[in-house]
Amino acid sequence: MNILKDKINKEGIVIDNRILRVDMFLNHQLDIELLNEIGKEFKNRFKDKEINKILTVETSGIGIACVVAQYFNNVPVVFAKKHAGSNMGENVYESKVYSFTKDIEYTIKVSKDYIDKEDNILIIDDFLASGSAMSGLIDIAEKSGAIVEGVGIVIEKEFQKGRKIILNKGIQLESLAIIKGFEDNKVVFK
């Protein structure tokens, strides 16, 4: 997706040839025009799927997922919580995930009230790197009996193992910008 790659090249900041900051348009401040283009692109790539729910993980995926949902007939968006409050109760699906950026393991949780075997889920997130968050979301969906129709990623770090993990599960993966690596603190796209 050229508009996304251009935005990454113009505004993204690479730190230590390993971390890409895009918080200025994707996961802190949101560029709504760009998110609408992302939503259209995911709709095009998953147009043959009968999606009735979008699943993501807090917090960076929520804004993206909400815009994407508008292109799938305003289906509900469910997000896995990293820090479930006492009002969530114990009737939850949960899975452990590791955050590459924060170097922390979380237990993510989704209430059993919001996903079940009737759901055809599209998982949406901002980044795919090690695949831990996606594995956790897929695990939660599978525990609920839902069908994971696909995974939509805005930016993928191809040089990490996330892609392989998802494809080995037989799930359609669509990434809008795929990064081969970093050189001299610049992004190298596939």
Curated annotation (Swiss-Prot):
Its EC number is 2.4.2.22. Pfam families: Pribosyltran. Keywords: Cytoplasm, Glycosyltransferase, Purine salvage, Transferase. It catalyses: XMP + diphosphate = xanthine + 5-phospho-alpha-D-ribose 1-diphosphate. GO terms for cellular component: cytoplasm. Xanthine binds at L20, N27, K157. It is an enzyme of class 2 (transferase). It comes from the Bacteria. GO terms for molecular function: xanthine phosphoribosyltransferase activity. 5-phospho-alpha-D-ribose 1-diphosphate binds at A129, S130, G131, S132, A133. Its main location: cytoplasm. The keyword ATP-binding does not apply. One of its GO terms (biological process) is xanthine metabolic process. The keyword Ubl conjugation does not apply. Belongs to the purine/pyrimidine phosphoribosyltransferase family. Xpt subfamily. Converts the preformed base xanthine, a product of nucleic acid breakdown, to xanthosine 5'-monophosphate (XMP), so it can be reused for RNA or DNA synthesis. This is Xanthine phosphoribosyltransferase. It comes from Clostridium tetani (strain Massachusetts / E88).
